[in-house]
Curated annotation (Swiss-Prot):
The lineage of its organism: Eukaryota, Metazoa, Ecdysozoa, Nematoda, Chromadorea. One of its GO terms (biological process) is regulation of chemotaxis. Residues 355-695 form the Protein kinase domain. Guanylate cyclase involved in the production of the second messenger cGMP. In addition, regulates cGMP levels by controlling the transcription of 3',5'-cyclic phosphodiesterase pde-1 and pde-5 mRNAs. Involved in the olfactory, light and pheromone sensing pathways. Part of the chemosensory mechanism of the ASJ sensory neuron that controls dauer formation and dauer recovery. Promotes the calcium flux in ASJ sensory neurons in response to onset and removal of a nitric oxide (NO) stimulus and is thereby required for the behavioral avoidance response to NO-producing organisms like P.aeruginosa. The gene is daf-11. This is Receptor-type guanylate cyclase daf-11.
Length: 1077
């Protein structure tokens, strides 16, 4: 029974075949046929292919296409889809033509898939899909079919799911719209272990995964099959076939625990799959319609065959695998169809021509003719809903509030103004409500005719006409300028431009050109000149709009024919200050014929110059002529021509004119501005001459904008240059900080995006140091005092390390770790660098006074070890360069097991020093028991020979944060530096030690005391015997180091013996390790 590991399948199959033993495969299907093997897997490639063949035959399909995603089954070790070549072979043997096979990736999007599957258009309409074990895996493909308009009337996708998951999961449960994508898709699903059949088995056992459940079910059936076969063979010996048991088993009818088991003559299990179809019209049963189960029959040459018959109760009708007229229409004769289409097109064309003719006739009868070109049929106007025209700028969260405010403004605006199209041209329509049919006299008709037909100028906006709808609304229509009005660009913050101060001359010049043309035309004067009616076209040319309209509106409002939709005044209050008070007085009394007679062409032109004065004031000073005035809706049908209260406010101006500070204005311009509001007003010619002289600008507005953009570009280049320099400076600071945190080579690799892999360094030395008594010192000091102390000490340590070629790995409180030999590889000098660092650090502490405790100095322990380590960068957001290995652990142990003011090292480091750098003086500490490592031999680093000592410049007491300089030449003696200054306490201690060591009697006495102590402590006897032997065999060095130590009380000998304070450190009882002079 087995195997239980897929990698052992062939090995077990060959072994059982050689042994002629029966093997029952329960793990996964394979495309191989092995004697003496019974394959219990329902997911084998052979069973999958036989199910598909029976389905295709049942629907009478002989040619298909396939889409395969091999990556989709990479994580599924039991998948049979990876043996697709076996499925192709079985198709070929059963005369199923596989026309095209498209292979796609696991994360292919629908756009790419839609391009790839176009290969099926000339060859296949039934497409087998092998894209995964879940229906969710097929959503992108179904979307691609929808994108290509592959309808359910043309193509049939067949989703193949060979994995038995005990229950299908439908992706449209949460979103019904997905069911439309899968509509009419056929699902071939392995449901051999239906939950209703295996419920008792599952209730008896529990499994962690579906795969484990399926394998257990197949194992259970395998044991049942074997038992049934053996039981039957005992009672019927003719069935027992020792050489080919699969032949005997295939001939049997085997009632399994979950249903009958069918084995074919090749020993492979044959089991039928379920066939389903997705139907979006079904509101129940998850949009699924069962089409039947592929049944198994033993009445065939292979002893087990599959057969599919569509359920008799199903209404599903499968499509053909080949279109009725072929893939290219080659089967059907298209001549008749072409003739029929041509006839239909001809009839439609005649109908369109007749309809167009009738429409033109109707339009002519409605007044859109040469005589009344200003009358626009309402059906020719296509209105646009401003409140629903949203662009991409409305989609961001930040603009949501602004979008809502804009909607409210547009909804209010839409009550009186509408954007529309007439003859495919965008227009703006002012809306009014009619109480009665409008009455036109000859003057009105002539005015409208002139406005429509004769007023054509570069600085005039085109008047389109007037239209009336069936709901008694009148619309006055003008061409739409989408850059808005000058009022928008001057007083609306969102549309102001910093360069607007340079454009006022061009704006005023365009206004005067248009106004001059109107004054010379048949309509004589504008009558409605405001900033709101000074429009800007796409070329930034000012076009005057609204001319002549006020004459009609005042007449119609006075006679009670019109009012506004929002019941506000016909003449908006925000525009009242543009009109001459004399003109407004006449409008209010327009019903009086004598008052109307006062509006002469000459009077109208003077009123236009008044309006121009207001515009000049607002353009030059960028300031409202009057405070903002607002209209309030009145009662229904009670709107007025002019709001008297607002008009009283507007009429208090314009005099006196006040020029704000900071704005320079030419005297001629001021004089003309004052004259515009006086009794003797300038004419157009004089106004143009003054504007052209005072605000002279060459070229058009576009030319000026190009110049401004050029100047802005040059300034922008300089700004970019300056910002780039600042950025580079900041990057340099960042790089310097990064170089402090990581080695230079590692930092450069990380900056360039190069992965820094861990690396093994065969030759490296690691040094650890730790302040003795730091915890008690912290408890007796303020936090800032501790920080100042550590900062001063580590600044000195860092400078020593940088000068000696080491690298500081980390600093944790008072603990300090230094490495040499990484990341810069050193063959042998790494141990020399560490020795120099340790000695210089020790000497530095002898002169480093605790800032907040004058006269008190720090004591440290040092320990180092040499050997192979591996190092690399840890972390991404806060990367740290760290090293690891047994050598690092042992170096840490050397520090923790050391003695204050002493430098301890391992045998490996001592041997490197002895072989390559004999100038360093070492002494044998002896064997030490190190926790977690065992007993090892350690040494003290005492110093350097007198002829090779390193000269160190004294640390200045008043420079707490910096070490001034350390001499790099090893040949200069430390004695040369100390000769220029009084002897310090360490020098006195050295002399004392030498004197004591010369005393032979004291040395013999100490040795005798040591022997007595060793007799009481067995382990210490062995250690000291080694020390005595080494002292006798190695001889005595010629020089004595500054940090040599003498013992004073041998009876206090311990792992960390007590001693007496000398200088700034502690001298311990280790006299036996110090040779005589």
């Amino acid at each position: 029974m087995g195997p239980t590991c897929s990698s052992n399948f062939l090995r077990f199959a060959n072994l059982t075949a050689e042994m002629q033993s029966l093997e029952i495969n329960i793990l996964k299907g394979y495309p191989y046929e092995h004697p003496t093997m019974i394959d219990m897997v329902t997911r084998s490639p052979q069973n999958l292919a036989q199910n598909l063949v029976s389905l295709l035959r049942g629907f009478e399909w002989g040619q298909v296409g396939a889409v395969l995603c091999e990556e989709c089954y990479e994580g599924d070790e039991l998948a049979s889809e990876i043996y697709f070549s076996t499925i192709e072979d079985i198709f070929e043997n059963n005369n199923i033509a596989l026309k095209e096979t498209v292979r796609i990736g696991k994360r292919e999007n629908s756009v790419n898939i839609s391009d790839a599957i176009t290969i099926f258009e000339p060859s296949a309409r039934v497409i087998l899909l092998f894209l995964g074990n879940k229906l969710n895996d097929y959503t992108e493909f179904m979307t691609a079919m929808s994108m290509n308009n592959y309808t359910t009337e043309e193509y049939t996708p067949v989703i193949v799911i060979s994995k038995n998951s005990l229950e299908l999961t439908f992706p449209w449960k949460e979103n019904d719209a997905i069911a439309e994508l899968f509509d009419k898709a056929i699902i071939v699903y392995n449901n051999c272990y239906d939950k209703s059949k295996i419920s008792s088995f599952l209730s008896s056992y529990s499994f962690s995964t579906i795969e484990e459940t399926i394998i257990s079910l197949q194992m259970y059936e395998g044991y049942h099959l074997l038992g049934y076969y053996l039981y039957t063979a005992i009672t019927n010996t003719t069935l027992f076939n020792y050489v080919q048991p699969e032949k005997a088993i295939s001939s049997m009818s085997i009632p399994g625990p979950f249903g009958e088991i069918f084995i074919n003559s090749n020993g492979q299990r044959i089991a039928g799959y379920d066939v389903l179809v997705v139907d979006k019209s079904l509101n129940s049963n998850n949009f699924i319609m069962p089409l039947g189960t592929i049944s198994t029959d033993k009445k065939c040459p292979d002893q087990a065959c599959l057969n599919f018959v569509l359920n008799s109760t199903s209404s599903f009708e499968p499509l053909k695998d080949v279109p009725l007229c072929g893939f290219h229409g080659e089967i059907c004769d298209q001549t008749g169809v072409i003739i029929a289409i041509a006839v239909i097109m001809g009839v439609l064309l005649m109908f369109i021509i007749i309809l167009t003719t009738i429409r033109k006739c109707c339009n002519g009868s409605k007044g859109r003719s040469i005589s009344n070109p200003w009358v626009i049929p309402f059906q020719d106007v296509r209105f646009i809903d401003l409140t629903n025209t949203e662009g991409s700028q409305h989609m961001s969260i930040q603009s949501l509030q602004r979008n809502m405010e804009e909607k409210q403004r547009l909804q209010s605006l839409a009550r009186t103004k509408h954007i529309a199209t007439v003859d495919q041209v965008y227009v703006l329509a002012d809306k009014y409500v009619m109480r009665d049919k409008l009455r036109y006299d000859k003057i009105d008709i002539n005015l409208l005719y002139q406005m429509k037909s004769h007023l054509q100028h570069d600085n005039l906006n085109s008047f389109v006409g007037i239209t009336i709808d069936k709901a008694s609304h009148m619309y006055i229509i003008w061409n739409q300028c989408f850059r808005g009005s000058l009022h928008d660009h001057i007083f609306t913050k969102e549309r102001q431009r910093g360069t607007a101060t340079r454009f006022e001359g061009l704006f005023l010049r365009d206004i005067l050109k248009g106004l001059e043309y109107i004054h010379a035309s048949a309509i004589d004067f504008h009558g409605n000149l405001t900033l709101h009616n000074c429009m800007l076209d796409s070329h930034w040319i000012v076009k005057l709009s609204g001319f002549g309209v006020n004459r009609l509106l005042v007449k119609w409002k006075t006679s009670g024919q019109i009012f506004t939709e929002d019941h506000t005044p016909v003449i908006k209050s925000e525009e009242l200050h543009y009109f001459d008070p004399a003109m407004k007085k006449i409008w209010k009394n327009y019903a009086d014929r004598n008052e109307r007679a006062l509006i002469t062409p000459q009077f109208g032109k003077k009123c236009d110059m008044y309006s121009f004065g207001v515009i000049l004031h607002e353009i030059i000073l960028k300031k409202k002529f009057v405070e903002q005035l607002f209209d309030s809706p009145r009662e229904e049908d009670d709107s007025v021509l002019i709001d008297d209260e607002n008009d009283a406010i507007a009429s208090r101006f314009p005099l006196p004119i006040i020029i704000p500070e900071g704005i320079e204005m030419h005297n001629d311009l001021i004089k003309m501005l004052e004259n515009c509001f006086g009794s003797v007003r300038p004419d157009i010619a004089l106004a143009r001459k003054i504007i052209d002289t005072v605000l002279k600008m060459s070229g058009s507005l576009v030319d000026l904008m190009i110049k401004n953009l050029t100047a802005y570009t040059q300034g922008l280049n300089e700004t970019v240059k300056n910002r780039t320099a600042e950025l580079e400076k900041e990057q340099e600071k960042g790089d310097q900080l990064l170089m402090e945190l990581l080695p230079k080579s590692v930092a450069n690799d990380l900056k360039n995006g190069i992965a820094v892999d861990p690396k093994v360094y065969e030759n490296a030395t690691i040094l650890y140091s730790d302040i003795v008594g730091f915890t008690s010192l912290c408890s007796q000091s303020q936090p800032m005092e501790v920080v100042t102390l550590l900062s001063g000490m580590y600044q000195r340590f860092d400078l020593i390390i940088s000068q000696q070629g080491g690298y500081k790995m980390e600093t944790i409180g008072d603990a300090y770790c230094v490495a040499a030999g990484l990341p810069v590889v050193m063959e042998k000098d790494h141990v020399k660098s560490i020795c120099m660092i340790a000695l210089l650090q020790r000497d530095c502490l002898h002169h480093f006074e605790i800032p907040h405790r004058p006269g008190t100095f720090l004591n440290c322990r040092w320990g180092f070890n040499s050997g192979p380590v591996f190092a690399g960068v840890i972390g991404q957001k806060a990367p740290r360069y760290a090293c690891f290995g047994e050598a690092v652990i042992l170096a840490s142990k050397m520090e923790s097991s050391g003695v204050e003011d002493r430098i301890q090292m391992t045998l490996a480091s001592q041997q490197l020093l002895e072989e390559n750098f004999p100038q360093f003086v070492c002494s044998n500490r002896g064997g030490r028991t190190i926790e977690g490592i065992g007993r090892i031999l350690t040494y003290w680093l005492e110093g350097v020979n007198a002829g090779e000592q390193v000269k160190v410049v004294e640390f200045q007491n008043d420079l707490n944060d910096e070490l001034s300089r350390i001499m790099k030449k090893d040949g200069e003696l430390l004695a040369a530096a100390t000769a220029l200054k009084p002897k310090d306490k360490m020098t006195l201690a050295k002399e004392k030690v030498i004197a004591e060591r010369k005393n032979e009697e004291e040395r013999l006495q100490r040795q005798q005391t040591l022997q007595e102590a060793l007799e009481e402590h067995e382990e210490e006897i062995e250690m000291n015997e080694v020390l005595v032997d080494e002292d006798e065999g190695e001889g005595k060095p010629k020089e004595v180091d500054l940090t040599s130590i003498v013992s004073t009380q041998m009876e206090e000998l311990e792992d960390e013996p007590a001693g007496r304070t000398i200088g700034h450190g502690r001298l311990d009882s280790q006299a036996s390790t110090i040779p005589d002079n």
